[in-house]
Amino acid sequence: MAGKGGKGLLAAKTTAAAANKDSVKKKSISRSSRAGIQFPVGRIHRQLKQRVSAHGRVGATAAVYTASILEYLTAEVLELAGNASKDLKVKRITPRHLQLAIRGDEELDTLIKGTIAGGGVIPHIHKSLVNKVTKD
């Protein structure tokens, strides 16, 4: 019977230690800050789980990788659009600047083939339409 008393005493000590640990709670760190990126890893992970057909099973690193790719592409497009707006001496990036930036870059143009609302058209005059100056 002495064995039971010892186990009860040990259980009381562990519950007291667990209660003490709960009172000193660590501050939660987001997965985005752990990965060193700005895009929300948790939100992207949730959205990936909603779209996958394998019973919502998505690896933890898949969301981090996807978020970092999206952040890189966004930074690339914004940098090119900012350069386009700076060339036109305007402080605000418009859909026209996005259009000029995306269509000006060959790789982004192949990636983003859709129409950008309010983007206008890319200025281009075909060679055959240009008047040729002839010397007489």
Curated annotation (Swiss-Prot):
Signal peptide: none annotated. Coiled coil: none annotated. Pfam families: Histone, Histone_H2A_C. One of its GO terms (molecular function) is protein heterodimerization activity. It is found in: Nucleus; Chromosome. Disulfide bonds: none annotated. Gene3D superfamilies: Histone, subunit A. It comes from the Eukaryota. Its main location: nucleus. Expressed mainly in meristems and dividing cells. In roots, restricted to the vasculature in the maturation zone. GO terms for cellular component: nucleolus; nucleosome. PANTHER family: HISTONE H2A (PTHR23430). Variant histones H2A are synthesized throughout the cell cycle and are very different from classical S-phase regulated H2A. May replace conventional H2A in a subset of nucleosomes. Nucleosomes wrap and compact DNA into chromatin, limiting DNA accessibility to the cellular machineries which require DNA as a template. Histones thereby play a central role in transcription regulation, DNA repair, DNA replication and chromosomal stability. DNA accessibility is regulated via a complex set of post-translational modifications of histones, also called histone code, and nucleosome remodeling. This is Probable histone H2A variant 2. It comes from Arabidopsis thaliana.
